[in-house]
Design a protein with these regions (language model features):
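Residue-level detector of intrinsically disordered, flexible termini
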Residues: 8, 14-15, 23, 34-35, ...
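Small/flexible residues
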Residues: 4-9, 29, 120, 193-195
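Sec-dependent bacterial lipoprotein signal peptides
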Residues: 1-22, 241
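Ser/Thr-rich, Pro/Gly/Ala-heavy low-complexity intrinsically disordered linkers and tails
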Residues: 19-72
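Divalent cation-coordinating acidic motifs and surrounding scaffolds
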Residues: 24-25, 55-378
Length: 378
């Protein structure tokens, strides 16, 4: 069993303990029209191949030569984004944020102008500061004995306390906000190291955004920058997804209004590690069934997009996850199996890609087709 709190605590030691060279991902930053300072050439500046750029000619209002006004199905889509907030995910979160405006513009063009979108972001732990209070107590005892940075026993709690404090956690003072400590609850105020550290204040007044958000791209960027300071022992992306979608769960109560019977569901998750049996409970088959159950058994009303490690695949982009957890990714056979269970409505991409726009563009037609064919229950 891996211990992620040990991992992030080790990252938190930094140069002070001389255990790591740093915690930032050293890959190139994301490219594309929404990356800061992007001035690339023709294909690089759009983040799309020539063929894909033709398909996504949003300015002409067409998708693959099809006039969206001539193909009308559902006009409601619920988007759930499950975003890993562990110590190695800073660049991946930024790549997701950079690709979002183009993705939503393409969806809008494919489905039509009378759209009704809702978007919610969840991270992969119950509370970013969940293990901080115990670390504070243990580190205080180490301080009293002058052992922080000296003994092996004190290395972990002292480092974890430092990590928590880097994310503006105050020992003995910081408490979770409403629903903030519920796994699968929509993120409204990302906290911890590297997070937006801003109350997103969605116009809906809920834990999700909708298409009427005055600055939708800005609101999504606020929520999706969940940071890299999670103190939890394990990453639980599939548990977070299941809890967010399961009727009667604590998260569902927090997320009231997000999941609608008359909308299709698009789940996107992004992580650089597999979801091992010691992390999320259940199996790919169980996760599939839980998501299908959230749509009253209609699995054709669901599209699933997964960005994760591909270094176990031919021509994969990822290098092995490095010991300092700053680069690469872990192969993710369980997550891959889950996505592939959705057939043509499951799309797999590399979390190590510098630009996620081509991946999202490849899924637009699947989302549009699911919407075209959707028949709401009742």
């Amino acid at each position: 069993m891996k211990s992620r709190s040990l991992r992030v605590a080790t990252i938190g030691l930094g140069a002070a303990l001389g255990l790591l060279c740093g915690c930032a991902d050293t890959r190139e930053g994301p490219s594309g029209p929404f990356a800061a300072g992007s001035t690339g050439g023709d294909d690089a500046s759009t983040g799309l191949s020539e063929d894909t750029a033709t398909i996504l000619d949003v300015g002409q209002g067409t998708m693959g030569g099809v006039d969206p006004d001539s193909v009308r199905g559902c006009d409601k889509v619920d988007f759930l984004f499950v975003v890993d907030n562990s110590g190695s995910m800073a660049d991946e979160q930024q790549a997701l944020i950079d690709s979002f405006p183009q993705f939503i513009s393409a969806i809008d063009a494919r489905i039509g102008a009378s759209h009704d979108f809702q978007m919610m972001v969840v991270d992969v732990d119950a509370w970013v500061f969940g293990e901080c209070s115990p670390a504070c107590s243990e580190a205080a005892a180490c301080d009293a004995a002058a052992n922080c940075g000296v003994t092996e026993e004190c290395g972990f709690p002292c480092a974890l306390r430092d990590l928590c404090e880097q994310g503006d956690f105050a020992c003995g003072q910081t408490q979770p906000e409403s629903c903030e400590d519920v796994l699968g609850a929509g993120v409204t105020h990302p906290r911890g190291r590297g997070a937006s550290a801003t109350a997103c204040d969605f116009a809906t007044g809920a834990r999700y955004m909708d298409a009427n958000e005055p600055d939708l791209a800005g609101a999504f960027a606020c929520a999706a920058k969940v940071g890299t300071g999670s103190s939890a022992d394990t990453e639980q992306p599939m548990d977070a997804m299941v809890q967010a979608l399961s009727s009667g769960s604590a998260a569902a109560t927090c997320n009231t209004g997000f999941l609608r019977d008359d909308a299709i569901l698009v789940v996107t998750f992004i992580t650089d590690e597999d979801d091992d049996p010691t992390d999320s409970t259940g199996s790919p088959q169980g996760w599939f069934q839980a998501v299908a159950d959230s749509k009253h058994g209609d699995d054709e009303a669901v599209v699933v997009l997964g960005l994760f490690g591909d270094n176990d695949q031919p021509q994969g982009l990822c290098t092995p996850l490095s010991h300092d957890f700053a680069t690469g990714a872990e192969p993710a056979p369980r997550l891959r199996e889950f996505v592939q269970m959705w057939g043509g409505r499951g799309h797999v991409g590399s979390v190590c890609a510098h630009d996620y726009a081509p991946f999202f563009s490849s899924a637009v037609d699947s989302i549009g087709q699911a919407c075209d064919e959707f028949v709401p229950p009742g």
